């Protein structure tokens, strides 16, 4: 039950793959959801108001 250097060597599997909708390497292999565009979770593209720079 260690959480140090010895357990870090066991991390070998890929968590994220390339998304086929947005192309970024953000598609979670286990949940099959893209954290960048929302593919697999919603049919619309994932966007938020806080992503854009403020005009003033």
Swiss-Prot record:
Organism in which the protein naturally occurs: Methanosarcina mazei (strain ATCC BAA-159 / DSM 3647 / Goe1 / Go1 / JCM 11833 / OCM 88) (Methanosarcina frisia)
Annotated protein name in UniProt: Large ribosomal subunit protein eL37
Zinc finger (C4-type) in chain: 19-37
Keywords, comma-separated and alphabetical: Metal-binding, Ribonucleoprotein, Ribosomal protein, RNA-binding, rRNA-binding, Zinc, Zinc-finger
A single BP term in Gene Ontology: translation
Gene designation per UniProt: rpl37e
Listed Pfam families: Ribosomal_L37e
Co-factor requirement: Zn(2+)
Binding annotation for Zn(2+): 19, 22, 34, 37
Entry annotated with the keyword Zinc: yes
GO MF: rRNA binding; structural constituent of ribosome; zinc ion binding
Function: Binds to the 23S rRNA.
């Amino acid at each position: 039950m260690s959480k140090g250097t010895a357990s870090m060597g066991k991390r070998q599997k890929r968590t994220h793959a390339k998304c086929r909708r947005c192309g970024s390497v953000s598609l979670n292999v286990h949940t099959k959801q893209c954290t960048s565009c929302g593919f697999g979770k919603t049919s619309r593209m994932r966007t938020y108001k806080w992503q854009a720079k403020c005009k003033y």
